[in-house]
Regions:
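Domain-level signature for soluble enzymes in the chorismate/prephenate branch of the shikimate pathway
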Residues: 1-298
C-alpha cells in the first residue's frame, strides 16, 4: 500500500507538522521552507496534500495564503484546528534554575510573557519553534532552552521542563488542507464550508452590495478579510469563509449576487467543516447564561 504524503511549512516538530500528524495519521510528513514550497510540492506531485496555516486565535491571519492559493492550481479540501500548547524544553539534566535564555519564534515569544517575567529569562528570537528546539539540542548547554511543541521535544531528544507555558489557553491555529483534486461534495452533505476569493471595485458601497445577498439569504459568514492588491493601499480583494454548499438554494442566490456586483470571484474550496467548530458551538451554548432561569431565580 502506498503511503500518502502531506507537506507543511516549517521544520520537523513544528506545529504544522503536529497538525499534519493529527489530521492525517499514518501519512508521511514533508517539511518545506516556505508556503510556496509547500504548495509546489503538491502541485508537482511530491505530496498529496498541503497543510497551510491561515489564521491564529491570538496572532490573527497568516499572510501570503490569499496570494498563493488562487494561482496554485489547488483546491481547499478540508480544514483543521490545532491547539497550540507551548512547552519549555532543554537538554536532559538541565533544571529551571539553570536556564538563562529562551529561544523561539517571534509569534510564540509574544505568547509567553508570563513565563519570561516569572523566571527572568532572556528572550532570543529564532526563525522557527522547531528550529529553536534543534538549536538547543545541538548546543547541548544547560542554560539554553526552547519553547516549542511536545513533538519538537520528542524529535530532538529534549526534556520538557514546563508544559502549557502560553499566556492564553485558547491559543489555536486554523489550517486549510489543499490538494490538486477534490471529491465533489453532495449538496446534502452536512456541515459544509465554502471559501471564496473576490475583488470589488474601489467605489463607495461596492462591498455592501457584494455582501448584501448573504444577509438577505441567511448565510453565516465566519471569516472576511481584506487585502491590498498591486501595491495599492485600497483594499479591493477579500477572502471569505461561509457556511453552506454553493448549490444550496440560499447560498447559490448569495453567490449569484456576489458575482454580479464584484469584479471577479473564485471559489477556492468546498469542504466539510472541522468537528472543532461543533465543539466550540456546544461550548459556547453551554456557557451562555440561562436567562429564563436567571429571571426566575432573581
Amino acid at each position: 500500500m502506498t503511503i500518502k504524503t502531506i507537506a507543511f511549512q516549517g521544520r520537523p516538530g513544528a506545529y504544522s507538522d503536529l497538525a499534519c500528524r493529527t489530521a492525517r495519521p499514518g501519512w508521511r510528513t514533508l517539511p518545506c521552507k516556505t508556503f510556496a514550497d509547500t504548495i509546489t510540492a503538491v502541485h508537482e506531485g511530491k505530496a498529496d496534500q498541503a497543510m497551510l496555516a491561515c489564521e491564529n486565535s491570538l496572532a490573527g491571519r497568516v499572510p501570503d495564503i490569499h496570494t498563493l492559493l488562487p494561482n496554485a492550481g489547488l483546491h481547499i479540501v478540508g480544514e483543521h484546528f490545532q491547539r497550540v500548547e507551548h512547552c519549555l524544553m532543554a537538554i536532559h539534566g538541565a533544571q529551571l534554575e539553570d536556564i538563562k535564555r529562551v529561544h523561539t519564534h517571534p509569534v510564540a515569544m509574544g505568547q509567553i510573557h508570563t513565563l519570561l517575567k516569572t523566571y527572568n529569562f532572556t528572550p532570543v528570537i529564532e526563525f522557527d519553534t522547531a528550529g529553536a528546539a534543534e538549536l538547543v539540542a545541538l548546543w547541548n548547554k544547560k542554560e539554553e532552552a526552547a519553547v516549542a511543541s511536545e513533538l519538537a521535544a520528542e524529535l530532538n531528544g529534549l526534556n520538557i521542563l514546563k508544559r502549557n507555558v502560553e499566556d492564553a489557553a485558547h491559543n489555536t491555529t486554523r489550517f486549510y488542507i489543499a490538494a490538486r483534486t477534490t471529491d465533489r461534495l453532495s449538496v446534502n452533505t452536512p456541515d459544509v464550508m465554502t471559501t471564496v476569493l473576490f475583488e470589488v471595485k474601489n467605489t463607495p458601497g461596492a462591498l455592501y452590495k457584494v455582501l448584501g445577498g448573504f444577509a438577505t439569504n441567511g448565510i453565516n459568514m465566519t471569516r472576511l478579510e481584506s487585502y491590498m492588491t498591486a501595491g495599492s493601499f485600497a483594499a479591493t480583494r477579500f477572502l471569505m469563509d461561509v457556511e453552506g454548499h454553493p448549490e444550496d438554494t440560499h447560498l447559490s442566490k448569495a453567490l449569484a449576487e456576489l458575482e454580479f456586483f464584484s469584479e471577479s470571484a473564485n471559489i477556492l474550496g468546498v469542504y466539510q467543516q472541522s468537528p472543532f467548530r461543533r465543539q466550540m458551538k456546544r461550548a459556547l451554548s453551554d456557557a451562555a447564561p440561562n436567562t429564563t432561569t436567571d429571571a426566575i431565580a432573581g
